[in-house]
């Protein structure tokens, strides 16, 4: 398996762990890996009446910084644009309040299971 395929598989595993964690917290899934010309939304969830756009970040090594630090201004802008397109295409959710959350999956210390942190309202649109 190539490094890129291995990385993609690990990313999908992190997204599945994050989704399962959020479901246990009472959120409902509206979409997974929703793609558009602007990018991809890892998870789209519903928390009460709030539409939640969730970015999942995984890190195996801290040498490049933590998972949260990897979401720079450019990535945030792509997430916001993707969320706007989601709401245009899925009009039934357009009038609901929205927020952007981040779930970090940390496997840097070899813990089993990995450490998950759910950061609500991680950034503003």
Curated annotation (Swiss-Prot):
Superkingdom per UniProt: Bacteria
UniProt cross-references to Pfam families, sorted A to Z: UPF0102 (PF02021)
Family membership noted in the UniProt record: Belongs to the UPF0102 family.
PANTHER family: UPF0102 PROTEIN YRAN
Molecular function GO labels: nucleic acid binding
Protein's UniProt name: UPF0102 protein PSPA7_4996
NCBIfam families reported in the protein's UniProt record: PRK12497.1-3, YraN family protein
HAMAP family in alphabetical order: UPF0102
